A protein has these predicted regions:
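C-terminal motif of bacterial Sec signal peptides marking the signal peptidase cleavage site
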Residues: 17-20
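Bacterial N-terminal signal peptides that target proteins for export
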Residues: 1-8
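Gram-negative bacterial Sec-dependent N-terminal signal peptides
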Residues: 8-15
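A sequence/structural signal for flexible, mid-protein segments enriched
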Residues: 22-305
Length: 305
């Protein structure tokens, strides 16, 4: 996920204040600033616990060269609510922004279970204030999987006999109780030479293109039937920017992460007023702590003859 942009944008969330009604105008000041713990973390069923980002918000006039954003000294505790077990997490430094976070580094096995309930508690000192936040997630239940992708190899925006553009389609087996599914498309052969310049969605100059603006796309479906059964997801052509192989990952998503994704960029009401995204935290927290079950398939995009 675009973890870096989420962390930085979430850090700004505590310093934006709407002072207008109906006009769609935002006045950004430091008047409403209060220190907050900013969390961005996911538990993935069957995967290690890692990359739990814990940072802070900051004032707009803050010198970020002198103000550490990551709360490396925070006390971060993962709680397995079903087993009544506590797991203190350790900060792992890394040159990679995405990998700089808290993780489970003990020899004791820690397996995130489908259907399990977990809480995250964070205690940290920010600007002399003792802050605390807590969030709880229930991992989607077992049963989710990708059943089929059709076609697995296709020309870019291929057409059927009637001249209609064919959209690749993924069939999934749903996780009982889960109604939100996220599809991501990641190019595996990304380069200036494989970028699809002849597309109807943008006009890019090969000499100026920033490939990393196009290296990750996502779509979702929501409000699917609650019970077990199959649903279909389309891979839209505006999510495909390169010829070659693409990894398609679909996630069955818990309520916390779904609420964040649904509200993170939709913060303006029809009347022009603004609201915060939906943060499922108690206490002094912003951001998201959620969970998901992933499954993966691949598609190859061919050049037209």
């Amino acid at each position: 996920m675009r973890q870096r942009s989420f962390v930085l944008a979430l850090s700004l969330a505590g310093v934006v204040q709407s002072l207008s009604c109906g006009e769609g105008v935002v006045s950004v000041t430091n008047q409403s600033y209060q220190p907050r713990i900013v969390v961005s973390g996911l538990l993935i069923a069957g995967h290690p616990v890692e990359d739990i980002h814990v940072s802070r918000n900051f004032r707009l006039d803050e010198n970020l060269n002198e103000t550490p954003i990551f709360l490396t000294e925070a006390a971060v505790l993962l709680i397995d609510e079903d087993e009544a077990a506590n797991y203190p997490l350790t900060f792992v430094d890394s040159p990679s922004f995405e990998k700089r976070g808290f993780a489970w580094r003990d020899d004791t096995p820690l397996a995130i279970r489908a259907g399990g309930t977990y809480s995250l508690e964070v205690r940290a000192t920010v600007e002399g204030q003792e802050l605390f936040t807590r969030a709880t997630t229930t991992v989607p239940g077992a049963g989710f999987e990708i059943v089929d992708l059709t076609p697995e190899r296709t020309e870019y925006r291929a057409r059927d006999g009637a001249g209609n553009v064919i959209m690749p389609e993924v069939t999934i087996e749903r996780s009982p109780g889960t109604t939100f599914y996220l599809l991501t498309a990641v190019p595996l052969d990304m380069s200036v030479d494989t970028f699809i310049y002849d597309n109807p969605f943008s006009d890019e100059d090969p000499r100026k293109i920033d490939l990393f603006d196009f290296n990750y796309e996502f779509e979702w479906i929501q409000n699917t039937p609650v019970g077990a059964g199959q649903s279909k997801m389309g891979l839209f052509w505006w999510d495909v920017w390169f010829y070659g192989r693409h990894e398609i990952v679909i996630y069955a998503v818990d309520a916390n992460w779904a609420h964040f994704l649904q509200t993170f960029e939709e913060v303006q009401e029809l009347d022009g007023n603004f609201h915060e995204p939906k943060f499922e935290f108690e206490g002094d927290g912003l951001g998201y702590f959620g969970s998901a079950i992933p499954d993966t398939t691949n598609i190859e995009i061919l050049r037209s003859d």
